[in-house]
Amino acid sequence: YVSFELDTFWAMRGGMDPLAVMDRLGDRLKLIHQKDFSKTSDSPINLWTVNDPNVLVTWDSFGKGSDHKDFCEIGTGIMDIQSIINKGNELGAEYIVLEQDHTQLTQMESVRISMDSFHKFSGLDW
């Protein structure tokens, strides 16, 4: 069968509940990409509210409704990361990769905040 890697941030931005997507993938989910969505973002969470789902997404239209300020350090935004970790463990996902497309901070400060936050979650092996 086919294994999957899920970016929970982009699943959410695509109007999906990341936990429901994870349930649907079941034990085929092997890797999780985890970002966080800023509490102060003015952008819509669901990008289909500003993009027509019946029109092919192109490189030029991909970013419509998205902004660099939508991204924030892990654990400082609105995503329910502990529930995502719990679901990943329940399904046997092997890895969670922390990822951040953009930051308002220096790269090193961003990494430090995300790692400090991620260490506070349970159900992870370091």
PLM features per residue range, with description:
Residues 21, 73, 77, 107-110:
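Residue-level preference for long, well-ordered alpha-helices that form the structural scaffold
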Residues 76-89:
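A short, acidic, amphipathic alpha-helical segment used as a generic capping/interface helix at domain edges
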Residues 1-72:
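Acidic/histidine-rich catalytic cores of soluble enzymes
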Residues 23, 86-89, 116-119:
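Surface-exposed alpha-helical segments enriched in charged/polar residues
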Residues 1-3, 28-30, 90-95, 124:
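Short, well-ordered coil/turn segments that N-cap beta-strands
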Residues 16-20, 79, 112-114:
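Charged helix-capping and loop-helix junction motifs
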Residues 105-126:
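C-terminal helical cap(s) of enzyme catalytic domains, especially alpha/beta-barrels
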Residues 97-107:
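A short, acidic, flexible beta-alpha connecting loop/helix-capping segment that sits on the rim
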